[in-house]
Each structure stands twice: as C-alpha cells, then as structure tokens.
From Swiss-Prot:
Transmembrane residue ranges: 4-24, 31-51, 64-83, 100-120
Subcellular location: Cell inner membrane
InterPro entries, sorted: FluC (IPR003691)
Regulation: Na(+) is not transported, but it plays an essential structural role and its presence is essential for fluoride channel function.
Native organism: Syntrophotalea carbinolica (strain DSM 2380 / NBRC 103641 / GraBd1) (Pelobacter carbinolicus)
Cellular component terms (Gene Ontology): plasma membrane
Family classification: Belongs to the fluoride channel Fluc/FEX (TC 1.A.43) family.
GO terms, biological process: cellular detoxification of fluoride
PANTHER family in the record: FLUORIDE EXPORT PROTEIN 1-RELATED
Entry keywords, A to Z: Cell inner membrane, Cell membrane, Ion channel, Ion transport, Membrane, Metal-binding, Sodium, Transmembrane, Transmembrane helix, Transport
The protein's name in its UniProt record: Fluoride-specific ion channel FluC
Domain of life: Bacteria
Primary site of residence: membrane
Amino acid sequence: MHLVYIAIFGALGCLSRFMVSGWVYALIGRALPYGTLAVNVIGSLLLGLLMEGGLRSAALPADIRMGITTGFMGGFTTFSTFSYETVRLLEDGSMVAAGANILLNVTVSVVFAGLGIFLARQL
C-alpha cells in the first residue's frame, strides 16, 4: 500500500509544484529560476514542520506518512530542476546568476528546514 499512497500524494505534490512555480514566475519573472527556488524553500520549511511537528510520532498510519513525506514533499520539491536550471545558466555564461541560484537554493532551503523544525518545537 505504501506505493499507492506515495503515487497519489506524489501526483498532488507535482501538481502543486507546477501551480506554485507558475504563480511565482508570473509574479516575479524569470531572471532567476524563482519558481524552483520557491518550491524548494517552501518544501524544506514544510518538511521540517511536518517531521518535527508530529508526523514521526503521529497516530497516522505509516502509509499516509510515507505518502506525505516521500510522495507529496518529494513531488513538490525538485532538486533535478534546480540542477538543470543551474547548468543552463552556466551554459548561457550567467556565472553570477548560477552562483546565486546555488547559494539561494541550498542556503535558504537549509535555513527554512531548520526554521520548520524550530517552529514545530514551539507548538
């Protein structure tokens, strides 16, 4: 059953990523891959909150927990797109933009995962 829940939640995560990313690009533009940055940062915050705030010890069945963490969060965040977009920036000669993309995705995502854990501990 794990696979069924992971697939269902994964599909929802992918659709959510598509919608959030598109909204961010429409709002801010495409000077940098802001849509990918947004989903990675939001996903890091949510996973920190969820893991520290109750999914580990919640009375949720293991299938649902796997669906949320591996499925939804895995479908929502995207390391492969971040990597691809960074390579494209490098190929285009946009070294500063590529460096900024790496720095922002890694640093801000890690900070927001920590923030999620911190916030969950305050609840």
